[in-house]
Curated annotation (Swiss-Prot):
Organism: Prochlorococcus marinus (strain NATL1A)
Enzyme class: translocase
GO cellular component entries: cell envelope Sec protein transport complex; cytosol; plasma membrane-derived thylakoid membrane
Name by which UniProt lists this protein: Protein translocase subunit SecA
This protein's record includes keyword Transferase: no
Subunit structure: Monomer and homodimer. Part of the essential Sec protein translocation apparatus which comprises SecA, SecYEG and auxiliary proteins SecDF. Other proteins may also be involved.
NCBIfam families on file: secA (TIGR00963)
Length: 944
């Protein structure tokens, strides 16, 4: 009703951009006739204009003024370099991002290309732009692919990857545009604020940031703070004992009601992800461990037992983690990717290692931490893009002050979303999924099946293998991760079946008929690897659809070849390469391989180096390197031959209905379901989607409550018969909304608590940066000393008492504790002075004593006082900050209980946290001044 009266606010927003789009189109006509060099000079012209402005506001208004022409320049460069022209709706997306908003753009609408527009415009300031992706693979791909446009226009493009050394990182951060993942940016920020020297800092001041898949980073990952930790010593034997003990404990089936424990040793709350021992469980555990009290401070066991229970019940192998090389590696619940190097904190990871009988790594202590919310709020200007933001619009607005604008699609969406099929049992659901997959596959349509865990993907793989359906598996298992790009490249081919764990953030569009460009790259790599790549790295041939896979809980048939039958092989969609190359092309490729061996050496390249050469050759950027030129010609030759077959395949796939997407479980968030649906019907293509669910699915089981339990009893239908019910659909939507609200509250709470830490963190980090910059260190230390003198006077002088009753003897002895050079100071020297005069007198004495100390030290070691000042301030700041982080963690745990005493835990946390921070800063100042006066540089050795 209100929309009709007032108009849709999103439409009103979009109308503002239409005149700007017209301006870009007018500029585009003027640029057509320019040479490449003339087009490139526009960059330096823009930059020279920006150099003349003096304030940030002036700079921003000039950028707005330059926007139409700058966008037209990027569009023209993209046409020349990539052969891709930004659509008008993509220009609108770029304008939304430049204004510091979130652009919601559907899958396949070219978000990656959109990011080039605001990135180029804002990089003209020379202060750096960060383009953030969810994983290293996407950062690398975008830097190579979209970076061509920026390099063509004369801008430098950087890439930060997990394996890079600090010097390399620094060089890449100094580029005009830097591609990186959210975690690399966050960890580099924390490491920079632990640096002992200015030369170790790799990042510049933040300016403008574009986040791809912004909902994944700012919403999904916001529950997990970034933590840098150091090792602490704790008994590893206790983890093993606790793991053995909990195996003998029995889980309670019911939950406690009215304070009465259920039968069993412990309760599990899957919603809160917690395990609680019952009274009976406490008694049994103490008996099994042969201890009197699990909470005994001298011999604490409760922490170990709780973690062991959570490891047993809530952390599931092949769902939450996989075991690889004697390690438990976390699987990201949103993207389905493994996260090597990341560990659960507070002893939880050690409990999982004990459960799996792996080597137990030492426990860690937090050295530095920040949440993604507070990290990204450090950027003066922040923007993001995603296919699904509208459902989280309120959170973006409240937490990040980011508005969301829905950008229209270039073509009308033709996708059909079929009605959900709900089954009573999980087993029936999986049989139905396998049947629909096989049926659609038989029609020659590609099928993408989204699963929620490694375990479930392998279960479906086994069911499809039994039905002789060739398929590819894309999950967190290392052997599958390595094949990710290959698998996605062929996922749109006729009859292709792809099982993928959580497609969120996969970043690669599924092209109907297959991706000829990527297949050509794979082919050239296959040909060149055997001749050019180092023997120890070997070459893994491109993957073909599998029929048999190893699967947990299923018996593997021995001696069965994984390759498909001859009958199936004849179907074009079953091979990674659509057609054998002609003899002429084969001969040219063999000749090229021999030539490159002479140029680059026999088996002398790493696999990554060869990838780099191939990626550069696949670009359209001008190059003088003759080897790259020849590689480029070879890739085009292969691509042309593949294109002939694949274009026909694309026509056939469109004719039979396009890509079919199957969801096998509702995610906790409707947004992630929409992301999976969005894989079908990209850019106006035909496509369809369907979700298969069961009443035993986690979402309904944990959050559906008693209503779903009642439904299970009410539906007296066959197991394999799908259920359709309005009440069931409402229960499902209600459960999802309940989960979204629940997790939003968790993120809000994390943000509110970290906001307290954030102000303290900013104060500590700015103090550190000032020290590293070496600005007026002496004045800073003297300032610390003067504050200490004031605090001593405040502690020992009570103005309510007459001066003769002031405890000047103790005051003087306290001053001497800090400044031993004032050994001649006597209480009688202070007689007759009022409180303020006392402070001024002691401050003056401190300054004189510090000058004496400096003169004495500098005489034998010139310049060492500044080094000592820097060392002691950093040492004290870092040590006390580390201890403070632990104290704040303990405080956070303890204030939670105060809610029972009608006190707001957050206010208690703020007040006590503030007092603790002030105390920390007081201790830091006192320790520094004490250390500086006690400092005795080592005597230089005099050679005989």
């Amino acid at each position: 009703m209100f929309k009709k009266l007032l108009g849709d606010p999103n439409t009103r927003k979009l109308k503002r951009y239409f005149p700007l789009v017209s301006d870009v189109n007018i500029f585009e006509e003027d640029l057509l006739s320019l040479s490449d060099d003339d087009l490139r000079t526009r960059t330096s012209e823009f930059r020279s204009k920006l150099e003349k402005v003096s304030s940030p506001n002036e700079e921003l208004s000039l950028l707005d003024e330059l926007l139409p022409e700058a966008f037209a320049v990027v569009r023209e460069a993209s046409k020349r370099v990539l052969g891709m022209r930004h659509f008008d709706v993509q220009l609108i997306g770029g304008m939304v991002l430049h204004e510091g908003q979130i652009a919601e753009m559907k899958t396949g609408e070219g978000k990656t290309l959109v990011a080039t527009l605001p990135s180029y415009l804002n990089a003209l300031t020379g202060r750096g732009v960060h383009v953030v992706t969810v994983n290293d693979y996407l950062a690398r791909r975008d830097a190579e692919w979209m970076g061509q446009i920026h390099r063509f226009l004369g801008l430098s493009v950087g890439l930060v990857q997990q394996s890079m050394a600090p010097l390399e990182r620094k060089k890449n951060y100094e580029c005009d545009i830097t591609y990186a993942t959210n975690s690399e940016l966050g960890f580099d920020y924390l490491r920079d604020n632990m640096a002992a020297d200015k030369s170790e800092i790799v990042q510049r001041d933040f300016q403008f940031c574009v986040i791809d898949e912004v909902d994944s980073i700012l919403i999904d990952e916001a529950r997990t703070p970034l933590i840098i930790s150091g090792q602490v010593e704790r008994s590893q034997e206790k983890y093993k004992q606790a793991a053995q003990v909990v195996e003998n404990l029995k889980r309670a089936i019911d939950t406690s009601k009215d304070g009465i424990d259920p039968e069993g040793d412990y309760e599990v709350d899957e919603k809160q992800r917690s395990c609680i021992l019952t009274d009976e469980g406490f008694a049994n555990t103490e008996k099994l461990l042969n201890v009197q009290d699990l909470f005994d401070p001298k011999e604490p066991w409760a922490h170990y037992v709780t973690n062991a229970l959570k490891a047993k019940e809530l952390f599931i192998k092949d769902v939450n983690y996989i075991v690889r090389n004697d390690e438990a590696v976390i699987v990201d619940e949103f993207t389905g990717r493994v996260m090597p190097g990341r560990r659960w904190s507070d002893g939880q990871h050690q409990a999982i290692e004990a459960k799996e009988n792996l080597s137990i790594q030492p426990e860690t202590q937090t050295l530095a931490s920040i949440t993604y919310q507070n990290f990204f709020l450090l950027y003066p200007r922040l923007s993001g893009m995603t296919g699904t933001a509208k459902t989280e619009e309120v959170e973006f607005e409240k937490t990040y002050k980011l508005q969301t604008t829905v950008v229209p699609t270039n073509r009308k969406i033709s996708r059909q979303d079929w009605v959900d099929q709900v089954f009573k049992t999980e087993a029936a659901k999986w049989r139905a999924v396998a049947k629909e997959t096989a049926d659609i596959h038989q029609k020659g349509r590609p099928v993408l099946v989204g699963t929620t865990s490694v375990e479930k993907s392998e279960l479906l793989s086994t069911l499809l293998s039994e039905q002789q359906v060739p398929h590819n598996l894309l999950n967190a298992k290392p052997e599958n991760v390595e094949r990710e790009a290959e698998i996605v490249a062929q996922a749109g081919r006729a009859g292709a079946v792809t099982i993928a764990t959580n497609m969120a953030g996969r970043g690669t569009d599924i092209i109907l008929g297959g991706n000829s460009d990527y297949m050509a790259r794979l082919k050239i790599k296959e040909i060149l690897s055997n001749r050019l790549v180092k023997p120890e790295e070997g070459h893994k041939p491109p993957v073909s659809p599998q029929r048999k896979t190893k699967s947990a809980g299923f018996k593997e048939e021995k001696n069965k070849n994984l390759s498909i039958s001859k009958q199936n092989q004849s179907k074009s969609f079953l091979n990674i390469f659509p057609v054998s190359l002609t003899e002429d092309t084969d001969a040219k490729l063999a000749s090229l391989a021999s030539k490159l061996v002479k140029e680059w050496g026999d088996r002398s390249l790493s696999s990554i180096e060869l990838d780099d050469y191939i990626a550069t050759a696949a670009e359209k950027t001008p190059t003088q390197d003759k080897n790259i030129k020849e590689l480029r010609i070879a890739i085009q030759l292969i691509k042309n031959e593949y294109e002939e077959v694949l274009s026909q395949e694309e026509t056939n796939v469109r004719r039979v209905g396009g890509l079919h997407v199957i969801g096998t479980e509702r995610h906790e968030s409707r947004r992630v379901d929409n992301q999976l649906r969005g894989r079908a019907g990209r850019q106006g293509d035909l496509g369809s989607t369907r979700f298969f669910l069961s009443l035993e699915d986690n979402l309904l089981r944990i959050f559906g409550g008693d209503r779903v339990a009642g439904l299970m009893n009410a539906f007296r239908v066959e197991e394999d018969m799908p259920i359709e019910s309005g009440m069931l659909t409402r229960s499902l939507e209600g459960a999802q909304k309940k989960v979204e609200t629940y997790y939003y509250d968790i993120r809000k709470q994390i943000f509110e608590y970290d906001e307290v830490m954030n102000n303290q963190r900013k104060a500590v980090y700015s103090e550190r940066r000032r020290v590293l910059d070496g600005r007026e260190l002496k004045l800073q230390v003297i300032g610390y000393g003067q504050r200490t003198m004031e605090e001593i006077v405040e502690a020992y002088v009570n103005e309510d008492l007459p001066p003769e009753e002031w405890n000047l003897t103790n005051l003087v002895s306290k001053v001497k504790e800090f400044i031993y050079l004032l050994e001649d100071l006597k209480p009688e020297d202070l007689l007759g002075l009022n409180k303020n005069e006392l402070k001024d007198f002691l401050k003056e004495q401190l300054r004189n004593a510090y000058d004496m100390k400096e003169a004495k030290v500098e005489q034998s070691h010139p310049g060492i006082m500044r080094q000592a000042e820097r060392f002691f301030i950093l040492q004290q700041l870092d040590t006390l900050w580390r201890e403070h982080l632990q104290s704040m963690d303990s405080l956070k745990e303890s204030v939670g209980l105060r809610g029972y005493g009608q006190k707001d835990p957050l206010i208690e946390y703020k007040n006590e946290g503030y007092d603790m921070f002030l105390e920390m800063m007081v201790n830091m100042r006192r320790n520094v001044i004490y250390s500086m006066f006690m400092f005795q540089p080592a005597q230089k050795k005099v050679e005989a």
